[in-house]
Curated annotation (Swiss-Prot):
Belongs to the gamma-glutamyl phosphate reductase family. It is found in: Cytoplasm. Pfam families: Aldedh. This is Gamma-glutamyl phosphate reductase.
Length: 423
């Protein structure tokens, strides 16, 4: 039987050691993990465990898309190894000194970046997350307790054994990365209440998982990765930009959190924009759910296809994660901002040549990332120059947007004196 208290205690002890690990040793551990992932014997063990999970998933009637996310191959293991090596090459944030000053009384003060401590990560049927999270937590000096979806229990256990064997060879504690491999859901609730040992919980999955964690946790929870993404096409838009940006945001990877869900178009340019957008997206099998004004424009332009349907009010505010796009014609910037304020918080973009309008949009939209003349798909740690990410936070505390190495740290005040006493 899995003892969550014991796992937590071991993680806390390992976290104290990890906080003191030099960068060179952490990097060596990541290189060892990467090497192990492409070692023939290790890979065979992981792939065998994964094959059992995948077969069970097929027998349970899981969707082809979910089966694909669950599946590991030698090529995917090689890609995970490459990603792990990329984390090793990133700058180590731990120990960074900033906001240094000397006070009038001569005290020397600075902030020093430190690991969060023990990070609990709960995720669904993506075994690659096991290694991604381990790499980021180790590099940032944290310990981690992992709980993957019940569909990938064997895969997660095999990957964790590989990680533990690799890191102990370089002097890191095996307990720095632990996995809860018992599918009992009650153990998740126990983890969410393990505030004696765990410093933060990061869920990676659907809205139901995020809600469950927020409701049950006695530990701070950083949620994100879910949200409705918008593009607003302004009356001053460069029309040549519109189709490529909308296509990229909607079609490139429709099942991810930074994919476009709703297109808002200024009525002054709607008759020019919508037919061009529709032609492009229909060719990629996108279903368009158009409001009354947008539907009229498309009908007048000769579009008559079951792929274009009248939008219901419920189609706005939906994260589709599929080849579906809702479209609304708006009277101008103010209406677009009101719509985004109601439904947005993840990734929202404006297409315009008017710098003043763009600045109003950037200031007014309260989302984790705001884009001007660029696709929402750039809300990603790698794309924003941060390297890998553990999640994309839509919260305002403690982190917002892509959570990379720096976001897995906090800081402490360091005060140095020369026998100072307070008057």
């Amino acid at each position: 039987m899995t003892n969550i208290e014991e796992i937590g205690a071991r993680a806390r002890a390992a976290g104290r050691r990890m906080a003191l690990m030099p960068t060179e040793r952490k990097n060596a551990a990541l290189e060892a993990i990467a090497t192990a992932l492409i070692d023939e014997a290790n890979a065979a063990e992981v792939l065998a465990a994964n094959a059992i999970d995948v077969a069970a998933g097929r027998d349970a009637g899981l969707s082809p898309a979910l089966i694909d996310r669950m599946t590991l191959t030698p090529q995917r293991l090689a890609a995970i190894a490459a990603d792990t090596r990329a984390v090793a090459r990133l700058p180590d944030p731990v120990g960074e000194r900033f906001d240094a000053t000397v006070l009038e009384n001569g005290l020397r003060v600075h902030k020093r970046r430190v690991p969060l401590g023990v990070v609990g990560v709960i995720y669904e049927a993506r075994p690659n997350v096991t290694v991604d999270v381990a790499a980021l937590c180790l590099k940032s000096g944290n310990a981690a307790i992992l709980r993957g979806g019940k569909e990938i229990t064997r895969s997660c256990a095999a990957l964790t054994r590989l990680i533990q064997n690799a890191i102990t060879q370089t002097g890191l504690p095996a307990d720095a990365i632990q996995v809860i491999d018992d599918p009992d859901r009650a153990l998740v609730e126990q983890l969410l209440r393990l505030d004696r040992y765990v410093d933060v919980i990061i869920p990676r999955g659907g809205a139901g998982l995020h809600r469950f964690c927020r409701e049950k946790a006695t530990i701070p929870v950083i949620t994100g990765g879910i949200g409705v993404c918008h593009i607003y096409v302004d009356q001053a838009a460069d029309l040549e930009m519109v189709v490529p940006i909308v296509h990229n945001a909607k079609v490139q990877r429709p099942s991810v959190c930074n994919a476009l869900d709703t297109l808002l178009v200024h009525r002054a340019v709607a008759a020019d924009v919508l037919p061009a957008v529709a032609r492009d997206l229909l060719a990629s099998n996108v279903e368009l759910r158009a409001d009354e004004a947008a539907l009229a424009i498309l009908r007048d332009a000769g579009f008559d296809t079951p792929q274009i349907v009248p939008a219901q009010e419920s189609d706005f505010g939906v994260e589709f994660m599929a080849l579906i796009l809702s479209i609304r014609v708006v009277s101008g910037l103010d209406e677009a901002l009101d719509h985004i304020a109601r439904f947005g918080d993840h990734s929202d973009a404006i297409i315009t040549r008017d710098a003043a309008t763009a600045e109003v949009f950037v200031q007014a939209v309260d989302s984790s990332a705001v884009f001007v003349n660029a696709s929402t798909r750039f809300n990603d740690g790698g794309q924003l120059g941060l390297g890998a990410e553990i999640a994309i936070s839509t919260q305002k505390l403690h982190a917002r947007g892509p959570m990379a190495l720096r976001e897995l740290t906090s800081y402490k005040w360091v005060v140095e004196g020369d026998g100072h006493v307070r008057a």
